[in-house]
């Protein structure tokens, strides 16, 4: 219902910074679209990561509310850190958006396998080359939705997360009787 609709409404623009590169500056980043034999563009990779993160949020919600909340909070921090970089940006000075996802290393094995954080670690885009004000607005809109989602699940503690408790009981049973 409502949580699903909110997740779907997220732009997750934190994962698609190249969408905000100014047309007049695109040539500077043309090599991002041609890495040897790989025909997948940087924008294509970013869109793929954005889709994976949307799916990841839905998967987390289905698996456990606690896991979902942790993922929401990590994305919140990533966006808040990026917004802070934008807020202190002075257009008269050069400032790159370096490793904007580097601090977000606490994803679980599923996230690591998908290399969801590669965009910020591999690509550096100068904020001066971006329509950073539009990006800032999109990031703020996502942050509001994430804050709402976290608020909606805040009262559900791990002790009251039925799916998590079932999983813990299954694990305890397997430990007590290791052979099926």
Report residues per predicted region:
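Helicase motor interdomain insertion/brace
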Residues: 1-180
């Amino acid at each position: 219902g409502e949580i699903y609709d909110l997740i779907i409404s997220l732009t997750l623009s934190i994962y698609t910074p190249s969408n905000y590169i100014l047309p007049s500056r695109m040539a500077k980043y043309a090599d991002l679209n041609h890495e040897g034999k790989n025909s997948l563009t940087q924008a294509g990779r970013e869109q793929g990561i954005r889709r994976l993160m949307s799916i990841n949020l839905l998967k987390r919600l289905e698996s456990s509310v606690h896991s979902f909340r942790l993922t929401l909070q990590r994305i919140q921090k990533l966006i808040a850190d990026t917004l802070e970089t934008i807020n202190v940006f002075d257009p008269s000075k050069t400032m790159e958006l370096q490793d904007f996802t580097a601090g977000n290393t606490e994803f679980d094995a599923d996230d690591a396998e998908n290399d969801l954080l590669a965009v910020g670690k591999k690509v550096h885009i100068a904020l001066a080359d971006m329509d950073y004000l539009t990006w800032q607005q999109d990031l703020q809109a996502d942050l509001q939705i994430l804050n709402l989602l976290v608020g909606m699940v805040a009262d559900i503690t791990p002790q009251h997360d039925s799916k998590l408790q079932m999983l813990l009981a299954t694990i305890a049973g397997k430990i007590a009787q290791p052979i099926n």
